[in-house]
């Protein structure tokens, strides 16, 4: 049987260039920072476009990865400018986008099919509203599941 599991990646939030540098100094393989206007960490994100470009260049020069987070549930007003706002970020060549909204994921897949997308821990789906297999957004990486399950563990059969 062939394993599809990759080696674990130590991923840390950047928030600032200083924090990014600390994360790498202490062993992080990758960092993430939010895209301005499209990230839930608006208050903890000092990354404007200039700092994103610098952070991506520094990370990749060290053989590290830099992911840009796009994890909002957008209002229609933000949808109108999303691809235009994303274009300069894509030109910076981040290693992947971390996304949560299925509609935005499908939009990126349609217009930027080669851009790697990792699924955010904020992503969710209501079972009866899941897209069909042919319309399902695809992601190249999935986060470990955050789950508190109501089932009691069962004892292994002896």
Feature roles, as predicted:
Residues 1-158:
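Non-catalytic helical/linker scaffolds that mediate oligomerization, partner binding
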